[in-house]
Amino acid sequence: MAYIAKSFYDLSAIGLDGEKIDFNTFRGRAVLIENVASLUGTTTRDYNQLNELQCRFPRRLVVLGFPCNQFGHQENCQNEEILNSLKYVRPGGGYQPTFSLTQKCDVNGQNEHPVFAYLKDKLPYPYDDPFSLMTDPKLIIWSPVRRSDVSWNFEKFLIGPEGEPFRRYSRSFQTINIEPDIKRLLKVAI
């Protein structure tokens, strides 16, 4: 089992640029973490909505995308290919993320990233779909399998400005619909 951090601010990740992303720098801001894939059926929608949320809250929200290839092999690019895939293939049309992307990682199983070990420990299932499971067990390519596992691409975790995991959302919950919860956490008029 992966080490589970004591605090959200003890965590870090490595960006696509190879630089360390220290979560301690996120104090006082809400953070939206989403496992992403560039070849999923909802890639265009979700990536565009992530950009939109980051643009709506440029100083008070941090959006982090964690590319993952564990669901249908839908992020099969190498780290150095991901941005070009997004720009020219899907979403395409010159798309550029306005948020940070990390290097590819596992979100489930023995090699799960410590960020996801922590978040799944604190938020073991999506609030909008507490019975959410992988729809096709033949697609499970990791071990061990746990009830709290992320079930597909574009599952989301919202963390409050004090570092407390607030809510987990299923893959079917549209990213843009998280905005009222972001406003609530930031105490912005809805």
From Swiss-Prot:
Keyword Oxidoreductase annotated: yes
InterPro entries recorded: Glutathione_peroxidase, GPX_AS, GPX_CS, Thioredoxin-like_sf
Signal peptide: none
Gene3D superfamilies: Glutaredoxin
Coarse class of the protein's main subcellular location: cytoplasm
Domain of life, per lineage: Eukaryota
GO molecular function: glutathione peroxidase activity; phospholipid-hydroperoxide glutathione peroxidase activity
SS bonds (residue pairs): none
One of the protein's GO biological processes: biological process involved in interaction with symbiont
GO CC, one annotated term: cytosol
Localization per Swiss-Prot or TrEMBL: Cytoplasm, Cytosol
Documented EC number(s): 1.11.1.9, 1.11.1.12
Active site: U40
Catalytic activity: 2 glutathione + H2O2 = glutathione disulfide + 2 H2O; a hydroperoxy polyunsaturated fatty acid + 2 glutathione = a hydroxy polyunsaturated fatty acid + glutathione disulfide + H2O; tert-butyl hydroperoxide + 2 glutathione = tert-butanol + glutathione disulfide + H2O; cumene hydroperoxide + 2 glutathione = 2-phenylpropan-2-ol + glutathione disulfide + H2O
One Pfam assignment: GSHPx
Keywords: Cytoplasm, Oxidoreductase, Peroxidase, Selenocysteine
Record carries keyword Protease: no
Family: Belongs to the glutathione peroxidase family.
Subunit structure: Homotetramer.
Function: Catalyzes the reduction of hydroperoxides in a glutathione-dependent manner thus regulating cellular redox homeostasis. Can reduce small soluble hydroperoxides such as H2O2, cumene hydroperoxide and tert-butyl hydroperoxide, as well as several fatty acid-derived hydroperoxides. Cannot reduce phosphatidycholine hydroperoxide.
Entry protein name: Glutathione peroxidase 2
Organism encoding this protein: Mus musculus (Mouse)
Gene: Gpx2
